[in-house]
């Protein structure tokens, strides 16, 4: 009987501390967003304020002497509706000043 109680106490001590450490360490670390990715998400949230961003991906980018363009595809959920939008950002590559932002909802 005494051995059984010692085994139970020891197992609680070992597994209890392991569980406490597991809660402290995050399972998934947040990925750092680039400046332009943050702008794309912010602009999409302006147009769709109640939407939740599920997924974001850079589709393409182009850099010329006087203009750079980046396009992102965002998957959004608004209520039960799930849809995609393309956010295209045009900016000056030297000053980083935004020239134009276009948001186009993906055709369903």
Swiss-Prot record:
InterPro entries: DUF3889 (IPR024987). Residues 1-22 form the signal peptide. Keywords: Signal. It comes from the Bacteria. The keyword Signal applies. It holds the Pfam family DUF3889. Coiled coil: none annotated. This is Uncharacterized protein YqzG. The gene is yqzG.
């Amino acid at each position: 009987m005494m051995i059984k109680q010692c085994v139970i106490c020891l197992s609680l001590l070992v597994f209890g501390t392991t569980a406490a450490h597991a809660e402290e360490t995050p399972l998934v670390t947040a990925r750092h967003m680039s400046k332009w990715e943050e702008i794309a998400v912010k602009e999409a949230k302006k147009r769709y304020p109640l939407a939740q961003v599920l997924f974001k991906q850079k589709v393409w980018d182009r850099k010329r002497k006087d203009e750079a363009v980046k396009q992102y595809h965002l998957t959004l959920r608004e209520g039960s509706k799930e849809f995609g939008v393309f956010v295209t950002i045009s900016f000056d590559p030297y000053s980083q000043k935004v020239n134009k932002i276009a948001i186009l909802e993906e055709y369903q």
